[in-house]
Amino acid sequence: MRLNPRELEVMKILHENDRALTSTEIVNCGAELTQSTVQAVLRKLLAAELVEVQGVTHSGNVLSRTFGPTEKSKDVLTQKFLDDYKAFRTIISKADAIAGMFATDEDLSNRLAEIEEIETLLAKLKKEVKSK
């Protein structure tokens, strides 16, 4: 599924928050997002099952739905990332891509935990390749 920049921005906002957000909260989190744009994007993402209504809350005197991402949305974003990487894989090696990803994380303890996670994954992948 192809997502336009506004849809990607709304998805990013929803994934970065640990709670469901109203459309107004999404507008306030985004750069240059308007209420009408966010509502149109949410309708499309709801139809595609990339977001879901997770509740209803009072927003002043009005009831507002709160939205959160679905598991499917993470899969779609992961696939978009991989498709983008595939377009540049002849230029950027996997090692350079991974090194660049680690360089973006300034939290050294988080970086160390992720390195250990990748080491475990690499050991598993190596074992699978050797067994074939």
Regions found by a protein language model. Give the residues of each.
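Short, cationic-aromatic polyanion-contact patches
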Residues: 3-6, 22, 56-78
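Short helix-capping/hinge SLiMs at alpha-helix to coil transitions
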Residues: 14-19
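Short acidic, hydrophobic short linear motifs in intrinsically disordered regions
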Residues: 20-29
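Amphipathic alpha-helical dimerization/coiled-coil segments
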Residues: 74-128
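A short, conserved structural fragment
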Residues: 46-57
